[in-house]
Amino acid sequence: MDHRLLEIIACPVCNGKLWYNQEQQELICKLDNLAFPLRDGIPVLLENEARALTSDESKS
């Protein structure tokens, strides 16, 4: 994931900062506890495509 892209994209739900989870290949919004998938290296920033983080994932 290009760090320059992370600087300009935001969570589509709250407009908050997204964090890259390299292991899961997801962009994480810690404010909304959502994980947005990457498909072929392209972020899918659609609320209906996001998954809710588990309570363990939210803590880390």
Swiss-Prot record:
Cellular compartments per GO CC: cytosol
One Pfam family here: Trm112p
Signal peptide extent: none
Domain of life: Bacteria
Family annotation (Gene3D superfamilies): 2.20.25.10
InterPro entries reported in the protein's UniProt record: Trm112-like (IPR005651)
TM helices/strands, residue ranges: none
Family the entry assigns: Belongs to the UPF0434 family.
PANTHER family in the record: PROTEIN PREY, MITOCHONDRIAL, ZGC:162634
Name of the featured protein: UPF0434 protein YcaR
Protein source organism: Salmonella typhimurium (strain LT2 / SGSC1412 / ATCC 700720)
UniProt gene name: ycaR
